[in-house]
């Protein structure tokens, strides 16, 4: 019979690898030095460290003249939050080549160029908020006058789109619609537009795809526009955008896919990469879980089984709120000496 002590204190094999270690604060004097430890801390900190390593590799290859086409996908809450400015900066600096987002990721970017969203609280009387005309996104408040102001700009914009479509004899695709919205911002708005993703995508000719362009306030405004005018002519074409998006993946020598959240943007990007045998680099930041079978929670390894991520790809998934980790990731890759 095996002795209890022998069961508990079973002999082990030696494990080779990186020792787990965190920063000793007497030895570090900057955030950069703290982040250098992340890969050795363990848990999700290690995953963030891996993401830094992957994105730096992509940046190095691009700096060497190698073509790595960077796709960025994000859900609307990224733009609701203060991550909007980080995304806009990345586009301005030429770090992103293709964007896929939801309708909220478009309209909220425009609205913030008109009036800011306000820091609120998670725990409020939501029925009272409704009475006051204040919408809530987590702990971010969006007074309804933002959408009223948005409508003042969008109705004339729809009229412009309708004229463009009549002149060219065919509908704008969603990405062309968003490009024209960027041009419209450039013409109509002041300095506040310079923190806008749409504006910088227009200036840098970065396509923004939004396959569900009507699923939000833009759709509400289109409904009002069409119903009040009996319009049957204004059409947004999403079919030709799928060709354009897929070809941006197919024609790339290498691709990197950075996904904040899940949902439609995530799948649109990795599915486009299926047509080239999978993306070469992938960074997922999500709080979604895999055990319900959702696309949002599917880890990169599941994407490998579909051919959407290459078997030999360099990839990592960080289970965390993007507002916590994305600023650290961007700063470490783009700004740390």
Swiss-Prot record:
GO terms under cellular component: cytoplasm
Names of the cofactor(s): NAD(+)
Pathway it works in: Protein modification; eIF5A hypusination
Keywords: Hypusine biosynthesis, NAD, Transferase
Reaction equation(s) it catalyzes: [eIF5A protein]-L-lysine + spermidine = [eIF5A protein]-deoxyhypusine + propane-1,3-diamine
Database matches in InterPro entries: Deoxyhypus_synthase_arc (IPR022899), Deoxyhypusine_synthase (IPR002773), Deoxyhypusine_synthase_sf (IPR036982), DHS-like_NAD/FAD-binding_dom (IPR029035)
Gene Ontology molecular functions: deoxyhypusine synthase activity
GO biological process: spermidine metabolic process
Active site, per annotation: 308 (nucleophile)
Domain of life: Archaea
Enzyme Commission number(s) of this protein: 2.5.1.46
Pfam families with a match to the protein in the record: DS (PF01916)
Primary role: Catalyzes the NAD-dependent oxidative cleavage of spermidine and the subsequent transfer of the butylamine moiety of spermidine to the epsilon-amino group of a specific lysine residue of the eIF-5A precursor protein to form the intermediate deoxyhypusine residue.
Family: Belongs to the deoxyhypusine synthase family.
Protein's UniProt name: Probable deoxyhypusine synthase
Gene of this entry: dys
């Amino acid at each position: 019979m095996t002795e209890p002590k022998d069961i508990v204190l079973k002999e082990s094999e030696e494990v080779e690898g990186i020792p787990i270690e965190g920063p000793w604060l007497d030895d570090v004097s900057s955030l950069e030095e703290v982040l250098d430890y992340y890969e050795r801390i363990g848990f999700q900190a290690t995953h963030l460290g891996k993401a830094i390593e992957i994105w730096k590799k992509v940046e190095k290859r691009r700096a060497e003249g190698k073509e790595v086409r960077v796709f960025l996908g994000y859900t609307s809450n990224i733009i609701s939050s203060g991550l909007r400015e980080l995304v806009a900066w990345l586009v301005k600096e030429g770090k992103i080549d293709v964007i896929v987002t939801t309708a909220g990721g478009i309209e909220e970017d425009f609205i913030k160029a008109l009036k800011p969203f306000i820091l609120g609280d998670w725990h409020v009387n939501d029925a009272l908020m409704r009475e006051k005309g204040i919408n809530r996104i987590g702990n971010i408040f969006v007074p309804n006058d933002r959408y009223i102001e948005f409508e003042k700009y969008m109705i004339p914009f729809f009229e412009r789109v309708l004229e463009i479509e009549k002149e060219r004899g065919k509908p704008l695709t969603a990405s062309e619609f968003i490009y024209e919205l960027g041009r419209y911002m450039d013409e109509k708005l002041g300095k506040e537009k310079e923190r806008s993703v749409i504006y910088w995508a227009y200036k840098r000719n970065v396509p923004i795809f939004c396959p569900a362009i009507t699923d939000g306030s833009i759709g509400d405004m289109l409904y009002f526009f069409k119903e009040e005018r009996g319009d049957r002519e204004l059409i947004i074409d999403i079919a030709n955008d799928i060709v354009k998006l897929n070809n941006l993946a197919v024609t790339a020598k290498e691709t990197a896919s950075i996904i904040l959240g899940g949902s439609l943007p995530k799948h649109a990007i990795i599915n486009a990469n299926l047509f080239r045998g999978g993306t070469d680099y992938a960074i997922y930041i999500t709080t979604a879980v895999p055990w319900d079978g959702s696309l949002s929670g599917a880890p990169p390894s599941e994407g490998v089984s579909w051919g959407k991520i290459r078997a030999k790809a360099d990839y990592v998934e960080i289970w965390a709120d993007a507002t916590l980790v994305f600023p650290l990731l961007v700063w470490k890759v783009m700004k740390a000496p």
